[in-house]
Each structure stands twice: as structure tokens, then as C-alpha cells.
Amino acid sequence: TYQWFCDVFNVFGLESNFCNVQFPQKLQSLSLTNQLMNAIWSSLILGLIISFPYVLWELWKFISPGLHKNERKKSKGFLFITSLLFFAGVLFSFYVIVPMSVYFFYHFEITDTIQNNFTLSSYISMVTNTLLGVSIVFELPVLIYFLTKLGLITPSFLKIYRKHALVVVLLLAAIITPPDVASQVIVSIPIMILYEVSIYVSRYVVKKQEKSL
């Protein structure tokens, strides 16, 4: 992944710290059962990620009897879209967010007198929390759809706070990425695209509701 970042930056003639990334220190296991428990926990999280479409399917089968026929047809499309966004979030997190976060936290130091020694548990926790967190963020268009249906969100509201959302995204990107603009842009663009898609989704819902009146 770091080599890919390096190659991308080189294409645009930009210098990058990713071209010479080294992690000489090894992760530490501080208890007898630590490696086993982390292996089990990682397997559970991986199983949850892989089984996400099946969990959605089972949830849909539970609520589908209470839906109208046309609603059942549309909800099948939501199963696909929700699963697609979830796995897109997993891939983006695993190949972009996690490597950048690891690089940042590994090299961050307040003073030279403090040495960073990372445990296996902290690493696994950071990776799993990031994977699940980013995957949930990628469900933003689906969330906006339902909030608009309930009348809690409008397209105009999302447009008004677009600049605020951009500032928040850039601040978060600046925190978890190395101090270069290119890295921040790589992280920010997909999230802002999701925000723009959410505006379109909200507008679509409002227009459809107006036609049905």
C-alpha cells in the first residue's frame, strides 16, 4: 500500500514520506493469552464483515411481511446498495485509512525522550475500529435517505452545511494523515463524494414525495 501511495505521488511529481516507510519495531504481546484472544477477536470481526449481506438479508426477511409489494421490491435494491457501500468502506479503510493512520501514530512523538512501543491489542483495536467506523460512514447516503423520508433532513439543509462538512472532513483527514496536502485530499475526496451523493438522494426523495401528494 505504501509503495502504491509513493507511485501515485510520483506520477504527479510530488514528494512523499511513503516512499521510504520502515517499521523496525515489532508489536508486543503483554500477556500469555493475548495473541490467542486477539486472533479470536479478529476472526469474529472478519466474520461479521463477511456475513454483513447475510445479516441484512435475515433482517429483511423479518420485516418484509409488514411491507407492501412495491416496498418489498425496492427494499431488495437497498440490500444491494447497503452491502456495496459497506464493502467499499471496508476496502477504503483497509487500503487507505488504516495504512495512513498506522504511519501517523507510529511516527508521532511529543518528545524524543518518549519511545513508542505498541501492543498487539492496541493495533488490532485500532484496525477493527477503523474498519467498522469507516464502513458505517460510507452508509451516509442510506442514512440520509431514511432521514429525508422521515422529514428530519432536507436537501437545502445539506447544501447549507456543505462547507461545514468539508471543514470537518479536512480536519479529520489532517489528524489521521501525514502532514502533506496530497494525503489529506486522498482521504477527503471519497467522503465528500458521499456527501454530494447524499444531497442528490435527499433531493430525489423530496421530489418523489411531492409527486405523490
PLM regions and their residue ranges:
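Membrane topogenic/interface segments and analogous intrinsically disordered interaction regions
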Residues: T1-L213
